Amino acid sequence: MKQQARRLLNKNEKGLLPREVYVLSVVAFFVALGYGMIIPAIPLFAKTFQVNNAQIGAIISAFALARFAMGLPAGKLIDLFGERRVQTTGLLIVAISTFASGLANSYWQLLTYRALGGIGSVMFSVSASSLLMRSVDDSIRGRAQSTFNGGFLIGAIAGPAVGGILSVISLRVPFFVYAFTLVCAAFVTSFFLSTKRLGKSIKNKQDPSDRILLAEALKSYPYVAAMAISFLSNWVLFGLRNSILPLFAKEHLGASNSALGLGFTIAAIVQGIALVYVGKISDFRGRRFALMIGSFTLLSGVATIIISSHWWYYFVAMVFFGIGGAFEGTAASSVVGDLFGGKGGRVIALFQMAGDFGNIISPVLLGWLVDAHSYRPAFIATAAVFSLTLLLSAKMPETRKLNK
């Protein structure tokens, strides 16, 4: 039985992915590389306008809120004009707004341009996910998603290092270089994803008769569960790991600034290594199995922090977070791809919005819990809420189809 499943799921014995997957992964690399460049520069550049920390935080939030608010409209645009046009347009919007950010002469200009960048960003991310889902079948979907996520991860690792070097020249330079990488990404999209290059195996626009309506998608338990898992995973990875864990590790575990940075590097490297195998596991063992591994691993990371008493617990937790993030990100997206095959821009957009909402709300709520009750109660509350993902995963029917 296992041999039959393996043969059906791996019709292409070499596991070769279609060209679209590699092109989208290159585009993801350019986007993440440039975004990583400006991450260390944004707060420093904003500070030059003599603003307070809350106003600096508003610049970060404006980008995220614009992404969230424009998610469903971006999905509608994809339904009307197709992924390739929307992706190219979105990348150019981010490129122009980023270049303008580098030229900003006031705080309000910078805030406005970053918000516009969020609109273009969600146009890119939703269209890329939709095209990726439509380009592959269930037999290789996990590997395709891992490859795409890997492009993002490599860019995200390299970006801050490059941005730090560029910031020495000027805090405006990273914005200009990021704009250039986005133009490169737009060129790759428009040229290498054109019908002339790829043929007509994937239509530029979806057939309206095949499109999945949002109301119909919301009746699917696996879809709703995948959204909940994405929300809760981002709660852990962005709210806990990225926001309050570094403060806890420094104040209570005695970790140095260099140790904090090393922890994030370790998590990124571990996640990159895990992505090599996660896609195959998801394809051969199923999405439900991969989601359960991811949920258990992330929960183990939170538990490690709860019982921590020394700085090395921080590194152990970051390893768990790297592995768990690879499983959850790949498997949850694969579930949505299995169910709908990218047929419905707003369906894909709402799934991404669930993750974005976790990014937005979790740092605020966890920060409030820390202020009101201290760190460990915030960690325990996170573990209690996130444990729901184990139940959601266990109840989820397998969405990967053996008869593709």
Regions found by a protein language model. Name each.
Residues A69-N105, S282-R288:
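Conserved MFS/SLC helix-loop-helix module at the cytosolic interface between two early adjacent transmembrane helices
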Residues Q4-P18, T195-A226:
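Juxtamembrane intracellular "pre-TM" segments in multi-pass secondary transporters
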Residues A64-L72, A156-I157, A268-V276, N359-I360:
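Residue-level signature of mid-helix packing/kink "hotspots" within the transmembrane helices
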